[in-house]
């Protein structure tokens, strides 16, 4: 303990000499440590080991920067293609669910079995495929016990959570139900054409038909939809618990906002994206052809209305960042910042090369299509032309 205090004192002195007020520890939540014998295959900031790490960095760092917290897919572990609103259920600490604080929703037997069967329990690496399935099964057990025991405090919390987060939760949960209905979670290949566009009707007839379909699916998969909300509630409760503990140690959590949108988000908000255009990276020293990321791009014309008020896309982005700042008092890191300020866009099916029509979304005044989005800068002004010319 004495040595640890000495190290912290020396580091503080060094930061003062360097004139640094902020010093952040960076770690993706899935990489957080686990206690001996309690390794499920995926880290959690909310775990006891997570608290120990917070204790360790306290006094040296004043913030912890986490990776993107969105829900990932079974076939894609990258947090940079996760959901923008829903939290990843993999970050829920199962150990906490066995405690009275969480009404012993999960049996210790199930928890211990998951830890014991973890194929990477003795390795410093996650077991993504394993825990993706095991975590969902464990949370299903917790949900069944929730319905069986009906703890009033948690029932009340769930209803409040659903009401306060209806703007995004209803769509995300509905997508889960539609994925079951259509046999896969990738909406572009769903056989039911209406299901592909339920949140984006183009006329009154579609609006009425889609509303009826939503009601049908919501009734048919009511339990699955409630289960989805239940998992999001648990993630939220544990996140709040972690935030409060970290703040008590003078540590603030920093979020990470990726430039991508998940399949679930594209489905829900597809009318807000620029049709036929994708986000990528221009040719550079690392790639002669550039990088075709395939991420959708927010339509600039949907960001603001003609009167200057926020458009539908603007409201979406405001809601997203508001949620992130509330959950993360340390702020938000934006991955690939230029992708938000002035993204490099290319035509779907083409390369991200200029000769194939690619360009900067907000600074291509001579581009046949993109010029209407160009924002004039000081360098664009002809200073030789005066008002009297």
Residue ranges, per PLM feature:
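Short, flexible active-site-adjacent loop segments at beta-strand->alpha-helix junctions, enriched
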Residues: 70, 181, 257
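Conserved, mostly hydrophobic/aromatic
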Residues: 57, 66, 175, 246, ...
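Alpha-amylase-like alpha-glycosidases and glucanotransferases acting on alpha-linked glucans and related
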Residues: 4-39, 75-236, 260-389
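Generic structural signal for well-ordered alpha-helices
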Residues: 50-54, 143, 239-243, 321
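Catalytic domains of carbohydrate-active enzymes, especially glycoside hydrolases
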Residues: 17-18, 45-73, 323, 327-331
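Conserved, well-ordered alpha-helix/loop/beta-strand core segments that scaffold catalytic motifs
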Residues: 228-260
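A short N-terminal beta->alpha junction/helix N-cap motif
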Residues: 40-44
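Hydrophobic faces of well-ordered beta-strands that scaffold small-molecule active sites
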Residues: 23-27, 62-65, 253-255, 332
């Amino acid at each position: 303990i004495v040595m640890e205090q000495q190290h912290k004192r020396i580091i503080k002195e060094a930061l003062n000499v360097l004139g640094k007020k902020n010093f952040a520890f960076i770690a993706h939540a899935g990489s957080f440590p686990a206690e001996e014998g309690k390794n499920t295959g995926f880290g959690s900031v909310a775990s006891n080991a997570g608290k120990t790490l917070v204790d360790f960095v306290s006094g040296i760092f004043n913030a912890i920067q986490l990776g993107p917290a969105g829900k990932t897919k079974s076939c894609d572990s990258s947090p940079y293609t996760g959901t923008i609103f829903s939290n990843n259920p993999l970050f829920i600490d199962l150990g906490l669910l066995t405690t009275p604080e969480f009404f012993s929703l999960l049996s210790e037997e199930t928890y211990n079995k998951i830890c014991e069967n973890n194929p990477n329990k003795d390795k410093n690496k996650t077991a993504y495929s394993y825990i993706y399935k095991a975590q969902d099964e464990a949370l299903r057990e917790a949900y069944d016990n929730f319905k069986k025991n009906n703890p009033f405090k948690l029932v009340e919390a769930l209803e409040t959570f659903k009401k306060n987060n209806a703007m995004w939760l209803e769509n995300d949960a509905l997508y889960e139900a539609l994925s079951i209905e259509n046999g896969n979670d990738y909406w572009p290949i769903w056989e039911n054409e209406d299901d592909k566009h339920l949140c984006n009707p183009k006329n009154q007839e579609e609006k009425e038909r889609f509303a009826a379909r939503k009601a049908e699916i919501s009734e048919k998969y009511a339990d699955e939809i409630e289960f989805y909300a239940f998992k999001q509630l648990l993630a939220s409760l544990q996140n709040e618990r972690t935030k409060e503990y970290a703040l008590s140690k003078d540590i603030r959590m920093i979020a990470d906002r990726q430039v991508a949108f998940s399949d679930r988000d594209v489905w829900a908000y597809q009318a807000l994206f620029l049709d036929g255009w994708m986000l990528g990276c221009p040719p550079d020293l690392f790639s002669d052809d550039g990088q075709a990321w395939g991420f959708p791009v927010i339509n600039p014309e949907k960001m603001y209305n003609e009167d200057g008020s926020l458009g539908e896309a603007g409201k979406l982005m405001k809601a997203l960042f508001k949620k992130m700042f509330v959950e993360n008092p340390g702020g938000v890191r934006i991955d690939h910042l230029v992708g938000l300020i002035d993204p490099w866009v290319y035509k779907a099916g083409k390369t991200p090369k200029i000769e194939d029509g690619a360009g900067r979304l907000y600074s291509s005044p001579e581009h046949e299509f993109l010029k209407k989005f160009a924002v004039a800068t000081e360098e664009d002004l002809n200073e030789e032309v005066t008002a009297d010319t």
